[in-house]
């Protein structure tokens, strides 16, 4: 994808500018995370406004995949979690370019666009207003492909928990209160940790989403318990993300 956008760029700086001019992305990495960024969202870019960042959502790192959904996360909007841009890199880029075609036309006025557009078409990317992301589409959560025998439980952070169905308690948990009792949630998650770690993780993430701004001992306890859940699910890379979060709090 970057090759199609930047094949004729003569420097890293020129490639960086090309991505910004075409997609409105400032290429970035893990430093874009906020305390409430879902661990499964791995930032690749920022927009330069209000902390908004874009990344790949990796629900289950143990599942081999050649591509992942792309989501946008706006940390200043506490009511909205990660929002789907595209189920793949190609779809996300096509949606972004189509949105710019509909609203501002900016990439298409550059002298490099005809050549870049031709390369993108060879990848199957053909921007069109009908493919644009309109304002009523901005709040789609990131729903993964669910393998046979697996289950996805949506969550308030827009990502949800994906795991083998046997890792969830047979009885779905009650909806989380807006002001949950953190101690009770920690106790419930602890009871599920070894037999039903996916349910435990869902409880902890829902509670954290509602309470993280307190930045108190409960916040750290929720994060520590999430680390245990990710290890129980054999997802050390996601446990490491939460460990880094703890270090930054």
Could you tell me what each predicted segment is?
Residues 1-67, 72-76, 130, 136-249:
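A surface-exposed partner-binding patch
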């Amino acid at each position: 994808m970057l090759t199609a956008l930047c094949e004729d760029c003569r420097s890293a700086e020129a490639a960086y500018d090309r991505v910004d001019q075409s997609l409105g992305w400032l290429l970035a990495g893990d430093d874009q995370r906020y305390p409430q960024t879902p661990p499964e969202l791995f930032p690749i870019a920022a927009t330069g406004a209000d902390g908004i960042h874009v990344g790949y959502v990796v629900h289950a790192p143990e599942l081999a995949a050649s591509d992942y959904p792309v989501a946008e996360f706006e940390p200043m909007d506490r009511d909205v979690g990660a929002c789907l841009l595209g189920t793949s890199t190609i779809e996300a880029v096509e949606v972004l370019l189509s949105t710019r075609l509909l609203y501002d036309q900016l990439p298409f006025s550059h002298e490099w666009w005809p050549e870049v557009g031709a390369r993108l078409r060879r990848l199957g990317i053909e921007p069109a207003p009908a493919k644009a992301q309109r304002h009523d589409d901005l709040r789609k959560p990131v729903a993964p492909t669910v393998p046979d025998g697996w289950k996805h439980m949506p969550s308030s952070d827009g990502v949800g928990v994906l795991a083998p169905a046997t890792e969830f308690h047979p009885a779905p948990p009650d909806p989380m209160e807006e002001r949950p009792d953190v101690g009770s949630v920690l106790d419930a998650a602890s009871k599920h940790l070894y037999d039903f770690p996916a349910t435990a993780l869902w409880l902890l993430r829902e509670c954290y989403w509602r309470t993280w701004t307190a930045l108190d001992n409960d916040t750290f306890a929720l994060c520590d318990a999430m680390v245990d859940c990710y290890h129980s699910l054999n997802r050390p890379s996601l446990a490491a993300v939460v460990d880094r979060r703890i270090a930054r709090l």
